[in-house]
Amino acid sequence: MMSIQSIITKETLKKKDTNIEIQEKNMNDLVESASRVIAPLWPIATFAAHHPWMGLEKQSFEQVADWLKEARNVDIYPSASMIHSAKAKGEIEESFLQSGLSRWLDSQSFHIPRKKVEQFCQAALKLEELPSSLLSSPQLNKLAEEMSYINTESMKDSFLQPVSSFIENQKGENLSDILNYHIIKWCKLYLDDSGSSWTMPNREQGLYRAWHHLIKFDPALSKNERSVLKDWPEDAEIALTRALSELGISESNKQAYLEGHLLALPGWAGMILWRSQQSTQEQELLIQYLAVRISMELAIVKPYLPIKNQKAEKKIAIVPLIASWIYWGNISTLKWSQMSAAEQSELLAFAYRFDENIRRKLWLEAWEQTHAEQLKKKISSKQRATNDKKRALAQLAFCIDVRSEPFRRHLEKLGPFETFGIAGFFGLPIATSELGSSDSHPSLPVILKPKHQIKELTDENEFKNYQQRKKIDSSVSYTFKTMKQNVLTSMLLPEVSGPLLGLQMVTRSFVPRRVGSFLRNLRKTMLQKPDTTFSLNHVHDTKCEIPIGFTKEEKVNYVRQALKMVGLTEKFAPLVVMCGHSSQSTNNPYAAALECGACGGAAGGFNAKVFATLCNLPEVREALSAEGIKIPEDTIFAAAEHKTTVDELEWIYIPELSETAQEAFDSIESVMPNVSQHANRERLMQLPNFKTEIKNPSKEAHRFAEDWSEIRPEWGLARNASFIIGQRELTQDCDLEGRAFLHNYDWKQDGSGDILASIIAGPGTVAQWINLQYYASTVAPHYYGSGNKTTQTVTAGLGVMQGNASDLLPGLPWQSVMQSDRETYHSPLRLLIVIQAPTKYIEHLLNNDFTFREKVQNGWVRLASVDPEGRWKNW
């Protein structure tokens, strides 16, 4: 007769094994491989959405969920309360849950009557917790004790915990917490970007060398701890190797051990990883970080060494397994005790497999399938014919950002306007340098690197006047910051600035909209930028890492590529407007998170203006005309910026307009107040602040943007759920509720499938990262979010912490995803990508793009298509 141990270990643990084969590697390779468990974390000023599991996509979503539950006790499936709330709102169709359960049962092997199993599963899927009275009952615990031999064999665990996590000092403090305290301190010192006027000594030599010089003087360490590090190696790699050796970590366990340390502070480790990817000087920074961390761990735990078992043993808990059959399977304790060992083994093995993760996985999939079905019905009921379209009066290209969807919908209803969706950097791989700035900012998705630098230029005299005004403004800020950071002047600063800042506090608090508008207009007047041009022509400057401007071929190529990507190669309107987007908020560390994700946390207006300027160049139009893309003479390209917080369109580039273009411009201007009113009303009514009809939506939106006490100026990209790639006619009359990324695509102009592949590789990846950033911050806010905005501390100019000694918080704040303390606003669904194209196009894409195919197969994104006849297919 097969024992219960063999049933559980052979049949069940196969599902749980998420380990990856680890071959012997040198230390550089080990650290690089271990870095898969964290994601790069951008500084908050250039906040870029990232999904925290980007290095783990070779494993399935389910495997990563199981592994994180074992490794860090982190749940990445929606909680029971989220699921119950979604079901109550009609967001989950019960039939999808039942079909999902049937498929799962069909895939399992068990020797229990199907009806009995289904009854157990149906009860368990109610997601009720087992009663504590049952779990603690003496009778149940006695039954479990009779089967205690099961616990002699622990579960296989692919995660090696840091040695410090198993040890407590005499005060009862876990040594891993003490280690984290030290590491946070050293990370803040080294990474500090603007927080102090005194920098870390020897910082230019790298983190490890700087730490090595100072650690012997650290008063926070005991004399014995400092003595361990007294003659410690000066080379980070040697030190890391030695520390691992003295801790007794075997060669086969090294990568798992390094992963455990990276996951201990994923925020600081993520920032270190990001820095290591930015320059060759810091490319070994992650090794240095681990060398510092594990060297300090050795110093702290050495008095306690050796410890017998460094692996986290997660023994099989028999009590809840028996309790689950008693509570959900209607089996009495008497009946259980009368069962044979084989019957008990079968029931326990099944209960172990049908664990909480599986139950919540089935609910998540039902939630996602319900959303897909609802989207399918919206699209199929609203499709319009694409033939014989009249020439639109104006065409406006917006970013794919979900916040563009309501604005576009209301705009199209109010006039003969056609809108397009395109990535907000408009296909221009540029670093932008605004007028008078010595620095440049990559203005493209963070997954790409800039290939050109574009500088803003103006008349020399105008430039001098502008610089003088700007210098006055910057000198005030610089003086304030210097006084604030200096030991002596910081004592005087409150006396000097108190009256002015006190007045600002009062006025900002009680009349935020008026004061904010006044200050904004005052600043705009003082720093009025003169008319500018761009350095569009190619210049080879040896001082710059990337060339300035474009060659003629590059100008034509970028314009052609963007126009073809959205299918705009004919029937041009008299006015074509490229609309970047930006946000507007006050006293908001996360301001960059509300900007354009396609522009690396910056506004998209600069790119829009550059692209529109390129489209108006005669040389570009002539070259495009020779290729069959004929832009009429009366068609003028302009640029604007969609202000998402107030839903307004701000014009930033209006060249001389033709008569028909002027008519189009006037028409847009005439409807814009109504568009703003409708879009603002729709958006504001979703905020928890409003329960009744809003009298003046635009006025309220401006108050939200200017109020420095407002913790939620807008929802950002919350509730994003789908990325629709196709012609606008597919979704034109659909109310997509601001939940869909929209990218125009015409498969008839993409014979090779290359355009579709580019959309998936670029905007598709950006949308997926944004989606999973919101997902992670919702389902595991304590680990992947950043807590409550009101208690955050901006630290080192890099990011936020809770208090002064927490991890650098990697995700979105509570206010970005939660409606209230108990109710989420964001629906944690994995991104559904819908492509309007024949089936063969999707097959070609999946066959040629291994990375995307892996994402789909492993459950990181969902994929559906709509063929030319309107038939929907799930892939």
From Swiss-Prot:
Binding site for Zn(2+): 399, 401, 581, 596
Membrane-topology descriptor: Peripheral membrane protein
Subcellular location as annotated: Cell membrane
InterPro entries with a match to the protein in the record: DabA
UniProt keyword Mitochondrion, yes or no: no
Cofactor(s), by name: Zn(2+)
Keyword terms, alphabetized: Cell membrane, Membrane, Metal-binding, Transport, Zinc
GO CC annotations, alphabetized: plasma membrane
Superkingdom: Bacteria
MF (Gene Ontology): zinc ion binding
Subunit structure: Forms a complex with DabB.
Protein family according to the UniProt entry: Belongs to the inorganic carbon transporter (TC 9.A.2) DabA family.
Biological role: Part of an energy-coupled inorganic carbon pump.
Protein name per Swiss-Prot or TrEMBL: Probable inorganic carbon transporter subunit DabA
The species this protein was found in: Bacillus thuringiensis (strain Al Hakam)
Gene: dabA
